Amino acid sequence: MPEVTLRHEFDCDEQTYWDKTTFDQAFNERLYRDVLKFPGYELLSLVDDENAKTRRVRIDPPLGNMPAAVKKAVGDRFSYVEEGRFDKKTRRYHFQIVPSAMRDKAKTFGELYCEKLGDNRVARIARVTVEVKVFMVGGLVEEKILGDVRHSYEAAARFTREYLKELGLTA
């Protein structure tokens, strides 16, 4: 299964990273709608208990310049639900993507975690794995998804730095 690991550094502590970005509704609204230009973003649920934060988000990504074979496989409209759980003890966010099309043939899952680099500096590591089992186009779809993941995480990292600075939360 193809996998990508991305690392981005931010001038904040780990708690600020999680609270003011990953689990902050205003941040995510701006990220998905304004920065990434996704047609749809909706927080379906966020449950915070003593052990974990569990979140479900529905996302409608732009289909844009998708190869014809891929577009045929997923259809004219595509969305997905991200189901994630942040374990407060291990401080890792594990997620899976439930697509609106090809549910039995496509798997995307991963994890996010932070490494402390200093008093007010962290590296956010994102590891994403993709598997698409569709004859003839599976590899194309995997390539498209991983390319989109790389692009989205790079844009999100730039926005995260700007957003933290805008809020006065950077070191």
Segments the model singles out, each with a brief description of its role:
Residues 53, 80, 85, 94-146:
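Beta-strand/loop substructures that line and gate deep hydrophobic ligand-binding cavities in soluble
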Residues 17-21, 126, 160:
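Hydrophobic pocket/interface hotspot
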Residues 1-66:
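Hydrophobic ligand-binding cavity/cleft-lining segments
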Residues 86-88, 139-171:
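A conserved amphipathic terminal alpha-helix motif
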Residues 1, 38-39, 77-79, 105-107:
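Short solvent-exposed loop/turn micro-motifs enriched in small/polar/acidic residues
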Residues 42-96:
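Glycine-rich portal/gate segments that line the openings of hydrophobic small-molecule binding cavities
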Residues 13, 23, 76, 148, ...:
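Short amphipathic alpha-helical segments
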Residues 31-38, 88-90, 104-105:
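Short secondary-structure junctions
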